[in-house]
Design a protein with these regions (language model features):
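N-terminal secretory signal peptides that target proteins for export/translocation
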Residues: 1-7
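Bacterial N-terminal signal peptides
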Residues: 10-20
Length: 279
């Protein structure tokens, strides 16, 4: 259970970094754009936020091969993907609390049609001989690798200070939740009516929810609260700080019969193994 939960938690953190920053950039661009004449008839979905999909690969690395695996990412994979036109690749890992030697790698999915291509961007760029060499070295380094398709739930998220940040927060408290079948709508309503107001009042860096659509728990949601230090985390839950002990107890009671299980961990962004279009 803990290994599965960590995978789901990591997925949410990865998605949060790309989705929230992307939306922040889009919002800033929209504010700077000149005003356009109002359309005669507005299209129903004209202002809808496009879905944010990401490909996430969870890799368990052999303890004695961590350095070799990291070198492959820095010297082979990242340069090749940049050359292939991939704009972003983010890597995350456990921050003290969780399993060691696990890494989560994320790249945005621009279109699902990309998976209809017979060759991956990495294979195309490296060529057959270099790609086979990379595969052989990678197999010697890893225990397992599992890829997911995740959907960001921006309608259940609060961007907070993410809009003005130039990079990802250092840490995140990530909570994996399994919802009671048939209670998903109740959970989402509670997030909108009760959770988001608390996060805004607590002035958190950002709060994010995602769903794993392919390869994960069909009833699973994952929430992330961002922090810049363990000292900030040590100040206590935003719900306790905003609502007080009695208010927090009443708040959590609302989730009885809605949340079947939850598990919490802390994760951090690894800048040395990541790249973005700005770099």
């Amino acid at each position: 259970m803990k290994r599965t939960a960590w995978r789901v938690l990591s997925l949410a953190l990865c998605l949060a970094m790309t989705a929230l920053i992307a939306v922040a950039q889009n919002t800033t661009a929209a504010k700077a754009a000149p005003k356009k004449p109002a359309a005669q008839k507005a299209k129903p979905m004209a202002d809808a936020q496009p879905q944010q999909w990401s490909s996430i690969t969870v890799v368990r690395v052999k303890p004695d091969m961590v350095t070799e695996w990291q070198d492959l990412q820095k010297k082979v994979v990242n340069p090749a993907l940049k050359k292939a036109g991939v704009k972003e690749r983010s890597v995350f890992e456990t921050a003290v609390f969780g399993e060691s030697y696990e890494y989560v790698v994320i790249t945005p999915i621009t279109s699902f049609a990309q998976y209809d291509e017979p060759m991956s961007p990495l294979r195309k760029t490296l060529g057959e001989d270099a790609f086979r060499d990379y595969q052989a070295k990678s197999r010697r380094c890893i225990v397992s690798s599992h890829t997911f398709g995740d959907l960001a739930r921006l309608d259940l998220s609060y961007m907070g200070k993410m809009m003005t940040m130039t990079g990802p927060p250092k840490l995140a408290v990530v909570n994996s939740l399994s919802i009671v079948p048939g209670r998903a709508a109740a959970f989402e309503n509670l997030v909108k009516s009760d959770v988001l107001p608390v996060m805004k009042k607590a002035d958190v860096i950002g709060y994010f929810i995602s769903q794993t659509m392919f390869g994960g728990d069909g009833y699973g949601y994952t929430s992330v609260v961002f922090y810049d230090s363990f000292a900030e985390i040590g100040k206590g839950s935003p719900f306790l700080r905003v609502l007080g002990p009695a208010g927090a107890a009443a708040f959590f009671a609302k989730f009885a019969g809605v949340v079947a299980h939850q598990e919490r961990t802390i994760a951090r962004f690894n800048p040395d193994l990541s790249f973005s279009a700005a770099q």
